[in-house]
């Protein structure tokens, strides 16, 4: 099996002065990335616990990742946007010996040794380190939200990461030495889709920070300054960027490939993108954190757009098997599946199975296969009951998005005494709404031809933009707070 450190070493030899990572004017070459990560690996080599990697979009976050891989201890990435209470819960769960803090923020009381960027830069350790990471070692642990409020640490094996990076490089048709855009913070595993495929193809990883996400104008400046070739983001992020009228092939002719993951890619968004970038390759992918980022892919073409709505997530990647249970729940089997949740046997045994050396994960996603392609139909636990009727909120959202008056939509249940009493549609219209009542009546009339009466939202809230989480996904919690007043 491929080993990403060996591949990285190849590019260090071949193109030492090429830029490996860039954030605004802060850059590290392949040589610098190799040397700085080797110095860090020397500091980490006696650590028996994963290293906590704290920060935002500093290139030294990548130094931290590569250094932790070389040392064999692995890493736990935490973005500065993560609330302090949650950071403390993660530190408490991991019990790290070393924290590499690349930010200016001070972490609260911890018994771990805290390293700063200057400690690595000033270190006199040798700039060479032979990687100690074995294929069956845990390379990273990413914490996802738990239903009880306690975050769950998803442990990913080095072999799984290598297999994933190799697959992604095979999907990337732009070639080696390209400019990659990464939107996701490092505590969100979508970032893995950009980091390792980029570095194992000799590319430059360009980091989008939270200010650029808040102000697309800053992102536009970055795109003008550095023409990108490969784009990796959530669908919600590209949806926001499509508000920039000049985000098109004429303006950005170098942008040849898009990868989307993390949430459902709406048909309308994909269609708008295909119209603006007719000669680019647009990939829709699907996968939970528990199965190493993504396990399916499909190139979205005019033909696919004309044939399917909602869009498929494609076919399983090599080495991964997918099947649906009688209830329609998608189960993933293969090397991509995580080793389970860190120090949480109860949660692990509930959704993972490791019998006979075969790893499976029950996703909680509803899925079907049609024409040899997989379709994700929302969360099994995203069903609600209204007046005795069981329904999928995402199905209503899909139908809402069909309207030419709707650019984006989210459906929010309104609860009273723990029971759903009605639904509200939060809608971003394609044009400003002059008469709310008339537009609501019109949309309801449209929905009547596609949905039963009980699934139609009682009222609609018209919004300029739907809020996003720090990961660049739709912030359903915030939307619910806004519409519920």
UniProtKB/Swiss-Prot annotation:
SUPFAM superfamilies: Acetyl-CoA synthetase-like. It comes from the Bacteria. Keywords: ATP-binding, Cytoplasm, Ligase, Nucleotide-binding. Disulfide bonds: none annotated. GO terms for cellular component: cytoplasm. InterPro entries: AA_adenyl_dom, AMP-bd_C, AMP-bd_C_sf, AMP-dep_synth/lig_dom, ANL_N_sf, DltA, DltA-like. Its EC number is 6.2.1.54. It catalyses: holo-[D-alanyl-carrier protein] + D-alanine + ATP = D-alanyl-[D-alanyl-carrier protein] + AMP + diphosphate. The keyword Signal does not apply. ATP binds at residues 144-145, 284-289, 365, 473. Its main location: cytoplasm. Belongs to the ATP-dependent AMP-binding enzyme family. DltA subfamily. Catalyzes the first step in the D-alanylation of lipoteichoic acid (LTA), the activation of D-alanine and its transfer onto the D-alanyl carrier protein (Dcp) DltC. In an ATP-dependent two-step reaction, forms a high energy D-alanyl-AMP intermediate, followed by transfer of the D-alanyl residue as a thiol ester to the phosphopantheinyl prosthetic group of the Dcp. D-alanylation of LTA plays an important role in modulating the properties of the cell wall in Gram-positive bacteria, influencing the net charge of the cell wall. This is D-alanine--D-alanyl carrier protein ligase. It comes from Staphylococcus epidermidis (strain ATCC 12228 / FDA PCI 1200). The lineage of its organism: Bacteria, Bacillati, Bacillota, Bacilli, Bacillales. The gene is dltA.
């Amino acid at each position: 099996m491929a080993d990403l450190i060996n591949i990285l070493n190849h590019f260090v030899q071949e193109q030492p002065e090429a830029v490996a990572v860039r954030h605004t004017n802060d850059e590290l070459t392949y040589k610098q990335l190799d040397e700085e990560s080797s110095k860090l690996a020397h500091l980490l080599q006696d650590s028996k616990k994963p290293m906590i990697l704290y920060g935002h979009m500093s290139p030294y976050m990548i130094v931290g990742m590569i250094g932790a891989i070389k040392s064999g201890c692995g890493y736990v990435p935490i973005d500065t946007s993560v609330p302090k209470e949650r950071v403390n819960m993660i530190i408490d769960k991991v019990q790290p010996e070393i924290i590499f803090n690349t930010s200016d923020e001070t972490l609260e009381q911890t018994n771990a040794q805290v390293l700063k960027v200057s400690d690595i830069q000033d270190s006199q350790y040798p700039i060479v380190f032979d990687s100690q990471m074995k294929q069956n070692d845990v390379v990273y642990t990413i914490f996802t939200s738990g239903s009880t409020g306690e975050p769950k640490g998803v442990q990913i094996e080095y072999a799984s990461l290598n297999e994933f990076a190799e697959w992604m490089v095979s999907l990337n048709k732009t070639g080696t030495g390209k400019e990659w855009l990464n939107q996701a913070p490092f505590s969100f595993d979508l970032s893995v889709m950009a980091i390792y495929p980029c570095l194992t193809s000799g590319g430059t990883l360009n980091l989008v920070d939270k200010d650029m996400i808040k102000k697309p104008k800053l992102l536009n400046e970055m795109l003008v300054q550095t023409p990108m070739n490969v784009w990796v983001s959530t669908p919600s992020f590209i949806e926001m960027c499509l508000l920039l009228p000049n985000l098109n092939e004429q303006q950005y002719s170098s942008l040849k490939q898009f990868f989307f993951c993390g949430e459902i890619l709406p048909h309308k968004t994909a269609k708008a993108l295909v119209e603006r970038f007719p000669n680019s390759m647009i990939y829709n992918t699907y996968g939970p954190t528990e199965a190493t980022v993504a396990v399916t892919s499909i190139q979205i073409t005019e033909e696919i757009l004309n044939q399917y709505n909602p869009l498929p997530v494609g076919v399983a990647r090599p080495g991964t098997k997918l099947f649906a249970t009688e209830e329609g729940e998608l189960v993933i089997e293969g090397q991509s599946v995580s080793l389970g949740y860190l120090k949480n046997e109860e949660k692990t045994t509930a959704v993972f199975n490791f019998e006979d050396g075969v790893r499976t994960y029950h996703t909680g996603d509803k899925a079907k296969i049609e024409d040899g392609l997989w379709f994700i139909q929302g969360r099994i636990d995203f069903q609600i009951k209204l007046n005795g009727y069981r329904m999928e909120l995402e199905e209503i959202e899909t139908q809402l998005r069909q309207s030419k008056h709707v650019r984006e939509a989210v459906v929010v249940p309104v609860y009273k005494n723990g029971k759903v009493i009605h639904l509200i549609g939060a809608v971003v219209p394609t044009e400003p709404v002059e008469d709310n009542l008339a537009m609501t009546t019109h949309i309801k009339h449209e929905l009547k031809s596609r949905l039963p009466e009980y699934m139609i939202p009682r009222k609609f809230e018209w919004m300029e933009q739907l809020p996003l989480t720090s990961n660049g996904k739709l912030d359903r919690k915030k939307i619910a707070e806004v519409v519920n007043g």
